[in-house]
């Protein structure tokens, strides 16, 4: 049964519509990846869902209309991680994580000892325990992304929206972040919608893949269930001719790889 549903969503900037009549649903514990060329509407979709961008249509979370929620209540339910955090003040990494509790604190109320401990544990989970008291502005872009993920972990939100979270991360941390997101969705019985630049990551870590082109859904794939031929045909509409190969790691885990084929 779906716990998050988008119905007939259209959005754009000024008078230019970017998204046209987008509808999809998300099951508890699932991760949906969004793939598409630049300008296809991936970021616009996330901004519309989290209320940053005005839109037509409905976004329902546990049958609650997100458009009707005050910003504070919306922030309790939905966490959005953009490509760049926008934080430009001198503040420690730990204090950034503590921002995840802000929607649950009253005006002028300070985080409790339990909240501070939880923030420290979240930093440890993302491999940033030794950076707790480091100035956030002095962190690398990848470390900043991990710090923001830790903030999301403590927020208690059930829906996570991420805009190309792997773009600033090295090879090792890309996989670590996706594994943590999967773990988070399962533990919270929540869900994640992620725009991704790397289709191989998407194929191996997402339960479903939404392919966008010019603001419309081309196809929705299930990498663990769909035939390779079907996925190749769909992905080729975005990336040009591609082939998918099912490989095994040394530990025996099956993974999908994608290769670019020559143009006919």
Q: Where are the model-predicted features located?
A:
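Helix-to-loop junction immediately C-terminal to a conserved catalytic motif
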Residues: 50
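Conserved ABC transporter NBD signature motif
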Residues: 57-65, 74
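Catalytic Walker B motif of ABC-type/P-loop ATPase nucleotide-binding domains
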Residues: 160-164
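Conserved ABC ATPase signature
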Residues: 135-139
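ABC ATPase nucleotide-binding domains
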Residues: 231-264
């Amino acid at each position: 049964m779906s716990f998050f549903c988008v119905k007939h969503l259209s959005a754009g900037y000024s008078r230019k519509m970017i998204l046209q009549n987008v509808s999809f649903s998300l099951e508890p514990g699932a991760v949906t990846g969004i793939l598409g060329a630049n300008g296809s509407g991936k970021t616009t979709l996330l901004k519309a869902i989290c209320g940053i961008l005005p839109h037509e249509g409905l976004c329902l979370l546990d049958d609650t209309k997100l458009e009707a929620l005050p910003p504070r209540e919306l922030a309790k339910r939905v966490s959005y991680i953009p490509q760049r955090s926008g934080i430009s003040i001198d503040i420690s990494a730990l204090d950034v994580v503590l921002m995840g509790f802000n929607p649950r604190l009253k005006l002028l109320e300070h985080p409790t000892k339990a909240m501070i401990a939880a923030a420290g544990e979240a930093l440890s989970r993302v491999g940033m325990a030794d950076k707790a008291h480091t100035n956030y502005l002095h962190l690398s872009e990848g470390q900043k992304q991990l710090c923001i993920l830790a903030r999301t972990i403590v927020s208690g939100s059930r829906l996570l929206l991420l805009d190309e979270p792997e773009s600033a991360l090295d090879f090792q941390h890309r996989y670590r972040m996706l594994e943590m997101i999967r773990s988070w969705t399962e533990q919270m019985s929540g869900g994640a919608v992620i725009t991704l630049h790397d289709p191989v990551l998407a194929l191996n870590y997402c339960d479903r893949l939404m392919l966008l082109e010019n603001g419309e859904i081309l196809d929705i794939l299930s990498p663990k269930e769909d035939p390779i031929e079907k996925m190749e045909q769909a992905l080729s509409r975005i990336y040009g001719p591609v082939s998918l190969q099912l490989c095994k790691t040394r530990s025996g885990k099956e993974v999908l790889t994608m290769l670019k084929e020559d143009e006919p």
